């Protein structure tokens, strides 16, 4: 059995995506977010939000052995040495940027690791904007007065954070 086990090939193989291609996908990601949301309002929420929403996100790309910091409000995408929130393959980050359902899919398939305390929750507060958009919830002035939606979002975020701490 040892020989058979050693002969097994890895099930999940990822393609390495070069950093320049990821950067191009990020530009499309920014355009998609900005076309569905009031970016000025997103900036205001980011500045005054008690839950630290829409902050820059730091991801370590395992196969490229670099960390990137991105901010769809400022449209910035840079390499960094700051502590990452999550770690994943370059193909997974590129998938998030190319698909409006990308982060949702990643949370289901689990192709990432949390590398800092509360890293997943912090990343979710930034990346979940497209999950909301896919549900027909855009960040616009009228959304601020839709208290059931705000309550739903905060309740789900709290549940996820509580489960991760357990």
Language model: regions and residue ranges:
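Feature captures hydrophobic
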Residues: 1-166
């Amino acid at each position: 059995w040892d020989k058979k086990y050693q002969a097994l090939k890895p099930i999940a193989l990822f393609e390495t995506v070069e950093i320049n291609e990821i950067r191009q996908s990020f530009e499309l990601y920014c355009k998609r977010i900005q076309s569905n949301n009031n970016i000025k309002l997103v900036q205001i929420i980011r500045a005054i939000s008690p839950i630290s929403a829409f902050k820059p996100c730091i991801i370590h790309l395992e196969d490229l052995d670099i960390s990137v910091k991105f901010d769809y409000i400022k449209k910035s995408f840079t390499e960094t040495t700051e502590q990452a929130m999550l770690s994943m393959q370059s193909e997974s980050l590129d998938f998030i940027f190319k698909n409006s359902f990308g982060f949702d899919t990643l949370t289901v398939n689990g192709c990432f690791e949390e590398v800092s305390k509360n890293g997943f929750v912090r990343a979710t507060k930034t990346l979940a904007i497209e999950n909301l958009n896919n549900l027909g919830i855009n960040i616009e002035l009228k959304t601020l007065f839709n208290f059931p939606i705000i309550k739903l979002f905060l309740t789900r975020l709290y549940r996820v954070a509580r489960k991760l701490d357990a």
